[in-house]
Amino acid sequence: MYKETILQNPVFEDFYKFLGSSDSQKIISDNGYVSTKDDTSSYVKENDFKGTINISGSTSLQPLMTLLAEKYETIQTNVDVIVSGGGSGTGYKNAENNVSDFGMISETFNSEKAPSCTSYEVAKDGIALIVNKVNSFDNITLEHLKNIYDCDINGEEKISTWGDLA
């Protein structure tokens, strides 16, 4: 996700174009993610740019974005792309508050979390849950999983065991 005004910067606009190129889509599909763009064309280097692009957010997308950044840096050798994690919440917050130029999220875009941002789907990822068969907790619901990952960030509620979810 990004603020549309950042595309007025030619470096950010060029990286945005690169993300939609067939070059990026090949990296995406070659690394186990689902490409979301059909009939894309190759990235064409129109200018030599110089600058820094900051991207932060989803840790599940971080490895992919790092690969995309590395490829872009081989083409635009005077551009540094800095990719950091922190989770989707960080992606929303940092893009909204101009800490990062682009935010990564691995969920459906929620405009209430970043009202001045626009969503741009680069790829889709999948997350699977595997539970040990000797775990006594069964019938795990989406709400249980949500409680694990949405526990109070201030530490007021700590989920340490499956029993804490019941």
Task: Map each language-model feature to its residues.
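Flexible loop/hinge segments at secondary-structure junctions
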Residues: 1-166
